[in-house]
Amino acid sequence: MAAASGASPQSEYIQHHLVHLNNLGEKQSVIAQFNVINYDSLFWSGLMGLIVIFCLWLAARRATAGVPGRFQGFVEMIVDMVNDQAKGIVQNAKSREFVAPLALTVFLWIILMNALDLLPVDLFPTIWRVTGLGAEHGDPLYYHRILPTADLNVPMGMSLGVLLLMFYYGIKIKHPAGFVKELFTAPFHAHGLAALVLAPFNLLLNLIEYAAKSVSLGMRLFGNMFAGELIFMLIALLGGAWTGFNASSIGLGIGHVLAGSVWAIFHILIVLLQAFIFMMLTLVYIGQAHEGH
């Protein structure tokens, strides 16, 4: 395969691991290809979402008025943290009844999706190869990625949901006429003829602001997780260079273990930090939708 394409085995390895299990059966040709459905991203994101729902349901079911157990105490700590952040950012108490649980769900969901990156790079490819489900091209699971947040569709889909909520609360709080008026009258306020002259510029700036918020929210999560996944693949190549008990292979093997361990420990911080940032920006953007310029 490598010889046929002219690419090195290392390049072929990385390219293979970056292809999704989709309805095409091959790598999509362009970044934005709307007829492509990535089944692996749908499965793993859905599974992580169900796990979040189950854990929260289990915590609610086991909740007691007395001294909480470890699991209940851990969940209550996270809930209180998210609720405190929501109270400080979204001032409307009625809106917080939905926004706070949403932020909690987003936070936990992204943590679980990101945490899939900590699994060994070749764990599932090896399982598919041994079981015959992904041994060669054409097998059902020959292409398969388990990290949903490294699929641009997932973070951008979530950021699109946040954008729609910004529009929803902006219209709900300010009413349709007030929302549209603000698009044309802010951030540069004026009266009379000056207001008419500035209206197109205000509209353009507001549209750019909404687009920038949405794109940056999704791209930040995608970029960090894609880079982390790629580094794990590069580290895995060190282990794949083993040729026997010789100085070169032993050195690469030790480097593989050390680099993998150090990056995995550091990546735990990235997993949690990116989930927290996405949650906080979700609260900030929705909170801003309640306010006027």
Swiss-Prot record:
Superkingdom of the organism of origin: Bacteria
Places the protein is found: Cell inner membrane
Any single biological process term in GO: proton motive force-driven plasma membrane ATP synthesis
Keywords noted in UniProt: ATP synthesis, Cell inner membrane, Cell membrane, CF(0), Hydrogen ion transport, Ion transport, Membrane, Transmembrane, Transmembrane helix, Transport
Stretches that traverse the bilayer: 40-60, 98-118, 151-171, 188-208, 225-245, 264-284
Keyword Metal-binding carried by entry: no
Membrane topology of the entry: Multi-pass membrane protein
Positions of disulphide bridges: none
Molecular function GO terms recorded: proton-transporting ATP synthase activity, rotational mechanism
GO cellular component term, pick one: proton-transporting ATP synthase complex
Function: Key component of the proton channel; it plays a direct role in the translocation of protons across the membrane.
Family of this protein: Belongs to the ATPase A chain family.
Subunit text: F-type ATPases have 2 components, CF(1) - the catalytic core - and CF(0) - the membrane proton channel. CF(1) has five subunits: alpha(3), beta(3), gamma(1), delta(1), epsilon(1). CF(0) has three main subunits: a(1), b(2) and c(9-12). The alpha and beta chains form an alternating ring which encloses part of the gamma chain. CF(1) is attached to CF(0) by a central stalk formed by the gamma and epsilon chains, while a peripheral stalk is formed by the delta and b chains.
Name of this chain's protein: ATP synthase subunit a
Native organism taxonomy: Bacteria, Pseudomonadati, Pseudomonadota, Betaproteobacteria, Burkholderiales
Gene name in the database record: atpB
